[in-house]
Amino acid sequence: MTSFGYRGKRVSPIPPKDKIDYKEVDLLRKFITERGKILPRRITGLTAKQQRDLTVAIKRARLLALLPFVNQEG
């Protein structure tokens, strides 16, 4: 028998003890769409606190011109 709706424990892509820093641009780019939008938590798999910290870091990096607000390549 299969149990529908059971997914098991989700593993966060970033270890919980690691700090999310606005200077780690390569890490932040993994959580942004091609158009520059921040991916939602249900897609990233982060914890609630990590998602909040990620959002703050991305917004801070945008203000310091490390990341673009909108990617207009396409």
Curated annotation (Swiss-Prot):
GO terms for molecular function: small ribosomal subunit rRNA binding; structural constituent of ribosome. It comes from the Bacteria. This is Small ribosomal subunit protein bS18. PROSITE patterns: RIBOSOMAL_S18. GO terms for cellular component: cytosolic small ribosomal subunit. Part of the 30S ribosomal subunit. Forms a tight heterodimer with protein bS6. Gene3D superfamilies: Ribosomal protein S18. Keywords: Ribonucleoprotein, Ribosomal protein, RNA-binding, rRNA-binding. Binds as a heterodimer with protein bS6 to the central domain of the 16S rRNA, where it helps stabilize the platform of the 30S subunit. HAMAP family: Ribosomal_bS18. Belongs to the bacterial ribosomal protein bS18 family. It holds the Pfam family Ribosomal_S18. The lineage of its organism: Bacteria, Bacillati, Cyanobacteriota, Cyanophyceae, Gloeobacterales.
